Amino acid sequence: MRPFNFNIQKKAQVILFSMLMCNHGNVFAQEKVASNVTSNDGNKKYNVLFIVADDLNCDMGCFDDPIVKTPNLDKLRQHAVRFNNSYCQYPFSGPSRASFLTGYTPDRTGVLDLKTNFRDNLPAAVTLPELYKKNGYYTARVGKVFHANVPNDIGKPGMDDPQSWIDTYNPIGIDRTEEDKVINVTPDRPVGSALCYMATDGSDDEHTDAIGANIACTMIKKNKNKPFFIAMGFYRPHSPYVAPKKYFDLYPMDQITLPEVPEDDWVNRPIYERFTDPINWGVEETKLREAKRGYYAGISFMDAQIGKLLKTLEEEGVADKTIIVFCGDNGYNLGQHGMWKKQALFEHTTRTPLIFSVPGLTNNEGKSSRVVEMLDIYPTLANLCNLKNIPQDLQGKNLLPLLQNPDAAWDGAAYSVLLRTPNRFIKYMKKGERALGRTIRTERYRYTEWNDGEKGGELYDYQVDPNENDNLYNNPKYKKIQKELQEKLYRKIEK
């Protein structure tokens, strides 16, 4: 297969958006796997509770983290399959959500920033909730499901997709109305992209996510006698890291540590991976640990709100016919490589939590190490619920075989993309410069190219280098592996 050798100007027109103009026959058609799963209640359809967290990585008890406490997600996983190697298609909220809610990669949606609406490029796309709506389901959104800027869009619809829903709710709490009280350890950055936190007095119910969870519980109660698709979009643990003080108290400062970063960590890797410039934003270690504590507090606070949802399903008698999907939108660095937040093509920024609980199917705790994509959520849910008129050009795969057997044979590789452009925080790039990173993750390796290799590349062997410290790109010993991974990457792009 010939390499992609477009120059960067052509890439802006071709690589980023070529899939928007391509013939639909050239787009990878989903492999439909017929589902023989039915709800426990005869003729009634499955309900769906779709839970999305914002900026959540896999540092959680439910993913075997020894520190971060998630008792309600721990309970959920007892009758679910958790995917330990699930990856987003873009490590940034807007592009990622547009991708998994439409079932198309960012190359196809054309969403590579926080300003573009996928409808601008795909006006006829049928989103996941919209398909449920067309199949007679009650569809509703609470909070952030499609993209919304945080904190500025809290209490507003943001970049919501109105035709996907029957009802929508935009909760707002003191995490927004009193955000002027947050402690910002990176004061040159606005709170939505800063390391900042606030431990509040008072109850959970004063906060946006608790208000939203209460609304979602009410919606479940009111619509329990009809098939529903209810999406609860939590704003936490996105910055500012705000939660009641009791959740901060779960994490004594002596438990909060930072990952070690070798002095030569950035010597042999493309500079375009670096989102945090300078390293750790020049913030002292104690302040970084305080911010990380706030992130953990936000996770435990969010988990408590999930507990309300699970309890309501049980109390209303619909738990045994409701599929629950829990996921994040992208990963999150907490000091890995001296970096914070998302917007990089590393493991911590592309790996996302994903849990599927399906009554009658995932009755026991299951854990899958197979590599899956967020794109797989759409075709999996649509087939589990036997929906009609599923788009035939979805780019994900049906996860049913892994829900039936988490260790089943699976030819999976995850594709992610990131467009790096200069801004007032990215000081190493020239005005007008663009760097397009594309990566593929297999069970053992990650292979990344920046501008088709013109601006460098990366190859990591996680079997011997789980922390991505040794870039093997163009290493003669890995020549064959690199070529195979490059071909896998290009096949993903062509689809």
Predicted regions and their residues:
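Short, low-complexity, intrinsically disordered N-terminal modules
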Residues: 5-8, 25
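Formylglycine-dependent sulfatase
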Residues: 2-4, 20, 29-451, 455-458, ...
